[in-house]
């Protein structure tokens, strides 16, 4: 791809060789002469003088203090987001030749495929599934009966989607994830045993959601477990039955969310946090890493601590704990004075 075409794609202006052929994307520290990179963080400006990249995307304000005539430059207002556009383009190019349905696919009755669908070897479909235009489904994935998957989705190898689940458009699901497995519902009997509660609901995943590898999203006991539009889930996250995660919320790895909890819009939840069931978290909440959320959160803000509290309170508690040894020393000194 010529540099002038890249500039057109990201709406930038070229300083240097318009005809330079770019074959890939690299880091500023290690990019080669046929690769393009970018600088958006001032910490990386020092690498401009030493990089071997053929071209660099820079902000309009970036001041080139040394003469590097061997490097071509594309000027843009926002190098970071321009680079994201370029990454998306190159990623799509890698998959542009993927099309068609393998002969080694098991298709149930009345399964409907949209246009330009790609299905790899050994994918299994149950009856009455519907797959939208341009969706790509990779090897060894199982999609049970009555599932609907929208357009432009990517479902990577070894994903399992249980019956009756609904997945929107432009959803990405990474390997090993299970969607629609039974919720953890058991009724304790008088004799101390447990009787399984049938999980009759479904999972609904709205548009533009990305789900990392080895996540588990349980079906509802009744109704729906819902992952709303724009949610991003990291790897190894447990979402229990009847949970609702609001739009554009992001959740880091190894978070567990117990049943029937409702999380608001635009929340950010740190890794290894645990959230109890049957509570509500309002919009615009930030939860730190490894936090135990044991009650509803009604006000936006940052919350931290093993026993969750507003961040300022948590800091005060930490300071008090650190001061305990000093207090002990003062108490001993006072005791010694009194005993004298």
Write out the residue ranges for each language-model feature.
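Terminal amphipathic alpha-helical/low-complexity segments used for targeting or macromolecular assembly
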Residues: 1-104, 170, 176-177, 182-196, ...
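Structural signal for interior beta-strand "rungs" in well-ordered beta-sheet cores
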Residues: 38, 100-310
């Amino acid at each position: 791809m010529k540099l002038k075409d890249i500039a057109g794609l990201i709406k930038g202006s070229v300083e240097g060789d318009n005809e330079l052929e770019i074959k890939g994307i690299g880091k500023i520290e290690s990019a080669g002469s046929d690769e393009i990179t970018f600088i958006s963080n001032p910490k990386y400006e020092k690498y401009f003088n030493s990089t071997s990249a053929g071209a660099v995307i820079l902000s309009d304000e970036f001041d080139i203090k040394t003469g590097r005539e061997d490097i071509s430059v594309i000027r843009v207002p926002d190098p970071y987001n321009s680079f994201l556009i370029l990454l998306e383009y190159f990623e799509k190019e890698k998959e542009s030749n993927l099309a068609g349905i393998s002969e080694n696919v098991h298709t149930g009755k009345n399964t409907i495929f949209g246009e330009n669908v790609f299905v790899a070897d050994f994918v299994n479909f149950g009856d009455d599934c519907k797959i939208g235009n341009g969706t790509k489904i990779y090897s060894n994935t199982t999609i049970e009966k009555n599932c609907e998957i929208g357009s432009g989705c990517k479902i990577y190898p070894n994903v399992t989607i249980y019956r009756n689940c609904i997945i929107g458009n432009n959803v990405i699901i990474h390997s090993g994830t299970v969607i629609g497995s039974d919720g953890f519902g058991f009724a304790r009997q008088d004799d101390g045993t447990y009787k399984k509660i049938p999980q009759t609901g479904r999972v609904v995943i709205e548009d533009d959601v990305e789900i990392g590898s080895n996540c588990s999203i349980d079906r509802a006991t009744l109704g729906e477990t819902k992952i709303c539009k724009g949610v991003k889930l990291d790897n190894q996250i447990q979402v229990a039955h009847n949970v609702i995660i609001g739009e554009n919320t992001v959740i880091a790895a190894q978070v567990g969310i117990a049943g029937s909890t409702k999380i608001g819009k635009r929340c950010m939840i740190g890794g290894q946090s645990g959230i109890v069931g049957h509570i509500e978290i309002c919009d615009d909440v930030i939860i730190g890493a490894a936090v135990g959320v044991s009650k509803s959160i009604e006000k936006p803000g940052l919350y931290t601590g093993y026993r969750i509290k507003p961040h300022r309170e948590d800091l005060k508690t930490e300071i008090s704990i650190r001061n305990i040894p000093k207090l002990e020393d003062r108490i001993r000194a006072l005791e010694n004075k009194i005993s004298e």
